[in-house]
Amino acid sequence: MSLIQEFKAFASRGNVIDMAVGIIIGAAFGKIVSSFVADIIMPPIGIILGGVNFSDLSVVLLAAQGDAPAVVIAYGKFIQTVIDFTIIAFAIFMGLKAINSLKRKQEEAPPASPAPTKDQELLSEIRDLLKAQQEK
C-alpha cells in the first residue's frame, strides 16, 4: 500500500474527521469567547473599576530605547486570557456534563431480554405438553 493510500485510509476514518471538525469548531468558539470577553465583559468591569482599559494594563520593565520596543509585563491581557479560559472551560464542563447524563440514562435502561433460542423454545413446548398430560 502506498503512502498516499495509507494516508487516505487514515484520514477517511470517522474518528479523525470528527476530531478535525471538533478542532475547527473549538477554534471558532475560542474566537467568539475572546471577542465576548474583550468587547462585552471587560469594558463594564473597567468602568466599575474607575475607567480602566484592561488591555492597556502593564508594568514597564525597560523603557523603549531607540528602535527597541519597551519590555513590559502585560497583565491586563493576561487577565482577559484567564477570563477567556474560564468561560471556555465552563462551557466544555457543561457540555461534558450533559453528555455524561445522557450516557447514564442509556446505561440505566434495562437491556432487552434476548429472544429465546430454538432449543429454549423446544424445551418450553415440551414442558407445556408434560404439564398438559399431568393435568389429565
Swiss-Prot record:
A single Pfam family, by name?
MscL
> Where is it mainly found?
membrane
The answer to keyword 4Fe-4S applying to this record is: no
* Gene it is expressed from: mscL
One function term, GO molecular function aspect:
mechanosensitive monoatomic ion channel activity
Membrane topology (UniProt): Multi-pass membrane protein
Q: What is this protein's function? A: Channel that opens in response to stretch forces in the membrane lipid bilayer. May participate in the regulation of osmotic pressure changes within the cell.
PANTHER family hit by this protein: LARGE-CONDUCTANCE MECHANOSENSITIVE CHANNEL, MECHANOSENSITIVE CHANNEL MSCL
Q: GO cellular-component terms in the record? A: membrane; plasma membrane
Intracellular or extracellular location(s): Cell inner membrane
InterPro entries listed in its UniProt record: Mechanosensitive_channel_CS (IPR019823), MS_channel (IPR001185), MSC/AndL (IPR037673), MscL_channel (IPR036019)
Annotated family: Belongs to the MscL family.
This protein's name: Large-conductance mechanosensitive channel
TM annotation in the entry: 9-29, 32-52, 54-74, 79-99
Keywords in alphabetical order, please: Cell inner membrane, Cell membrane, Ion channel, Ion transport, Membrane, Transmembrane, Transmembrane helix, Transport
